[in-house]
Amino acid sequence: RVILVKLADRLHNMRTLEWMPEEKRQRIAMETRDLYAPMAHRFGLNSVKAELEDLAFKWLEPDEYRALAKMVAQTRADRDKLTGEMADPLERRLRENGVVVHEVSGRPKHLWSIFKKMEKRAKPYDEIYDLYAIRVMVENIPECYHALGVIHGAWTPLQERIKDYIASPKSNGYQSLHTTVFGPRGTLFEIQIRTREMHRTAEYGIAAHWVYKAEGKGGKDLDRHLAWFRQVL
């Protein structure tokens, strides 16, 4: 619980960093990128990690941040349209094949992760093609594998990008099936398939585990405590 409070406090500081002197701002941003974001990742707090990284990026490399944010904003309408062209038929295909689907939605890529891809591949933004992501939430683990089979039957996957983090969870407890397929206009789509419980763990990591263990059950109590944690953040 102490770690959660520390991370929430750091996130609050990063959101208000503009009011601090430049030297202190740089120090805090670097510390956030190098220490607090990896800490959030270690405890499975993926949404916290992503926001900390983006905020650190904003202050440590402001020119690159502004340029990338502008490009992402300019292409948002086209990305949303293309994501819909993939998500709608994907959900329809799953339901037609009897998969119990709770949600199919676009998953935005964070600026820092896009920037790191550009750096690693030495390519500009308009040549990074795996920027599209979709999340599929289903009823249970068998439905995860059922959904994966249906998706691979309808869209061609990249074999080297299929990952089973359900059978082999990450060290922070993260579980999902990952695949990358060719969607509309030959665009690559990264697809995550998970249950709602896996989604809670992916978003809130140790917080979800701590609350679940404390309550000894899920349901309304779990949701109530996670709502508290969201409010803290």
Label each PLM-derived region with a short phrase.
Residues 1-3, 10-233:
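Nucleic-acid processing machinery
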